[in-house]
């Protein structure tokens, strides 16, 4: 029976990554709130909030604490991940929310601690008296001890997965799921579908360069021309040098390949370099040599186009 309860608790234990993600979400929310708040004073005198920045931040974080931890027993990041705080000092196995004193001490340790650190830094920054120097050394020593304690707590958290922050360990509160978590069934349908599509995409990437798209397009164009019966008009334009047999536009630097049709130099040269067995899409003549077109075209014909 005890082994079954232990396995159930381990199955419902909050993952370390979920607790760390909740902390990161809280930091992102604080940055977003502060950036949006400072945008409200964008048109005011520069440096207006600089003198009272620690107090303003403390007020905003206190406002967030009032409507998150104090009322809902969870931060915003924890609520997103279906996590909440639990009173670890309670012997009752049923969920017990943190007491009012624990919530108040949590606000004092987190909000008050950050405010005190920022305000003391501003206070000691421009003071050079001996008394202030000793107080600054004591403050730095205390901050160093707290940093060391946070490091040790983080190492213990990585090992045991409980108490993500030093404040939670000191106050005796830890993260639990809001609702009991069922055993998740692993399905591979999505993975199989993704592997199938990735394999198909790699096959297309390998196959498409082997297909002569331009030659295939020319074949289809010639078949469509035969089906629509417009070969006489196209041959007239091609033989008169007014239309490229590949792109269908006025030939730029017109060249021939040994038949009566005319090509742009870029069109015929690129097609020939891509396919040494390139043939004319209109009449099927093989390329013997690419020669400039030697023909006289009246300016009246050019203007008529």
Curated annotation (Swiss-Prot):
Name its pathway.
Answer: Protein modification; protein ubiquitination
Residues in the signal sequence: none
Q: Where does Zn(2+) 2 bind?
A: 259, 261, 280, 283
| Catalytically driven reaction(s) | [E2 ubiquitin-conjugating enzyme]-S-ubiquitinyl-L-cysteine + [acceptor protein]-L-cysteine = [E2 ubiquitin-conjugating enzyme]-L-cysteine + [acceptor protein]-S-ubiquitinyl-L-cysteine; S-ubiquitinyl-[E2 ubiquitin-conjugating enzyme]-L-cysteine + [acceptor protein]-L-lysine = [E2 ubiquitin-conjugating enzyme]-L-cysteine + N(6)-ubiquitinyl-[acceptor protein]-L-lysine
The record's keywords, sorted A to Z, are:
Disulfide bond, Membrane, Metal-binding, Peroxisome, Peroxisome biogenesis, Protein transport, Transferase, Transmembrane, Transmembrane helix, Transport, Ubl conjugation pathway, Zinc, Zinc-finger
Membrane side Cytoplasmic: residue ranges:
43-48, 126-133, 212-305
- Pfam families, sorted: Pex2_Pex12
- Zn finger (RING-type) location: 244-284
Topology relative to the membrane, per the entry? Answer: Multi-pass membrane protein
Q: Which GO terms describe its molecular function?
A: ubiquitin protein ligase activity; zinc ion binding
Q: What class of enzyme is it?
A: transferase
Answer yes or no on keyword Flavoprotein.
no
GO biological process, alphabetically ordered: bile acid biosynthetic process; cholesterol homeostasis; nervous system development; neuron migration; peroxisome organization; pexophagy; protein import into peroxisome matrix, receptor recycling; protein ubiquitination
EC number of this enzyme = 2.3.2.27, 2.3.2.36
In terms of one coarse class, where is the protein primarily found? Answer: membrane
Residues the record lists as binding Zn(2+) 1: 244, 247, 264, 267
Disrupted gene: phenotype observed: Mice in a C57BL/6J x 129/Sv strain background die several hours after birth. Mutant mice do not feed and are hypoactive and markedly hypotonic. Cells show defects in peroxisomes, characterized by an accumulation of very long chain fatty acids in plasma and deficient erythrocyte plasmalogens. A significant proportion of mice in a Swiss Webster x 129/SvEv strain background survive 7-14 postnatal days. Surviving mice display defects in cerebellar growth, characterized by a reduced granule neuron population, abnormal Purkinje cell dendrite development.
Q: Does the keyword Disulfide bond apply?
A: yes
Q: Which domain of life is it from?
A: Eukaryota
Tell me where the transmembrane regions lie.
16-42, 49-74, 99-125, 134-160, 188-211
Subunit note: Component of the PEX2-PEX10-PEX12 retrotranslocation channel, composed of PEX2, PEX10 and PEX12.
| Family note | Belongs to the pex2/pex10/pex12 family.
Q: Could you tell me what this protein is called?
A: Peroxisome biogenesis factor 2
- Species of provenance: Mus musculus (Mouse)
Could you tell me the gene encoding this protein? Pex2
């Amino acid at each position: 029976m005890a082994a079954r309860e232990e396995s159930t608790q381990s199955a419902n234990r909050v993952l370390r990554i979920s607790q760390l993600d909740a902390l990161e979400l809280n930091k992102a929310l604080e940055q977003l709130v502060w950036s949006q708040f400072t945008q409200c004073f964008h048109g005011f005198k520069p440096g207006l909030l600089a003198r009272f920045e620690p107090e303003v931040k403390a007020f905003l974080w206190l406002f967030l604490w009032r409507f998150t931890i104090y009322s809902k027993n969870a931060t915003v990041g924890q609520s997103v991940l279906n996590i909440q705080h639990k009173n670890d000092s309670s012997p009752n196995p049923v969920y017990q929310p943190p007491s009012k004193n624990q919530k108040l001490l949590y606000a004092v340790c987190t909000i008050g601690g950050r405010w005190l650190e920022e305000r003391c830094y501003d206070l000691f920054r421009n003071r050079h008296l001996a008394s202030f120097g000793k107080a600054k050394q004591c403050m730095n020593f205390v901050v160093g001890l707290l940093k060391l304690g946070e490091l040790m707590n983080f190492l213990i958290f990585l090992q045991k997965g409980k108490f993500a922050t030093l404040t939670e360990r000191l106050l005796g509160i830890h993260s639990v799921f809001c609702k009991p978590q069922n055993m998740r069934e692993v399905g591979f349908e999505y993975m199989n579908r993704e592997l199938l599509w990735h394999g198909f995409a790699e096959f297309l990437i390998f196959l498409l360069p082997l297909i002569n798209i331009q030659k295939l397009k020319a074949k289809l164009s010639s078949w469509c021309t035969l089906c629509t019966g417009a070969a006489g008009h196209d041959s007239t334009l091609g033989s008169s040098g007014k239309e490229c047999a590949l792109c269908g536009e006025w030939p730029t630097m017109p060249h021939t390949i040994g038949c009566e049709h005319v090509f742009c130099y870029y069109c015929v040269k690129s097609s020939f370099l891509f396919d040494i067995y390139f043939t004319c899409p209109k009449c099927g003549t093989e390329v013997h040599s690419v020669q400039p077109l030697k023909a006289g075209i009246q300016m009246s014909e050019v203007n008529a186009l």
